[in-house]
Amino acid sequence: MHDSVTVHMAAPPERVWELVSDVTRIGRYSPETFEAVWIEPATGPAVGAQFRGHVKRNEKGPIYWTTCTVTACEPGQTFEFGVGNKPGAPLNVWRYDIVAAGDGSDVTESFTLTPTFGLRLYWAVLGWSRGKTNHNGMRTTLERVRDDAEGREATTQ
């Protein structure tokens, strides 16, 4: 229960990291998470910082808030967060890895689901559909980040 997408961006790793680690920008990039806010006292990315993401599942609904905790934060390299209210026991983990490559950066977005019984059952029945949605959503997110990082207007739907 893991997938990833990599997109090359003609921008330095520091610029890309600045964009993906600023969760308040997520509404510009993600097809599902349309806003996010830092939970006080957090005001920016740091391990242990928490934020709330406002999600519209499958771009149709249901609409809900989820709590996220930053679990890895290396400027210019990595931004990772766990989703779920239990610190240390996330439902899933989303991660951005940024590597300098040629004229810019190769950026990989990935997710890993915690293999609970309920999630295993869900993925056995509907996982093919949700997996495709996640894969396409990661590609869309990275393409929109690329547009911003390269100085073009990010295209939103």
Go through the PLM ranges and name each one.
Residues 49-58, 80-86:
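Short beta-strand segments that buttress and anchor functional surface loops
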Residues 5-7, 39, 65-72, 92-100, ...:
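Hydrophobic/aromatic beta-strand elements that line small-molecule binding cavities or substrate pockets
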Residues 1-6, 14, 50, 65, ...:
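Intrinsic-disorder/low-complexity, polar/charged segments enriched in Ser/Thr/Lys/Arg/Asp/Glu/Gln
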Residues 1-43, 47:
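Hydrophobic ligand-binding cavity/cleft-lining segments
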Residues 13-14, 43-45, 71-77, 97-106, ...:
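A short, structured loop/turn motif at beta-sheet edges
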Residues 15-20, 26, 51-53, 70, ...:
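Hydrophobic pocket/interface hotspot
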Residues 82-140, 145-147, 156:
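Beta-strand/loop substructures that line and gate deep hydrophobic ligand-binding cavities in soluble
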Residues 57-64, 115-118:
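Short, cysteine-centered beta-strand-loop-beta hairpins and adjacent loop/turn segments enriched
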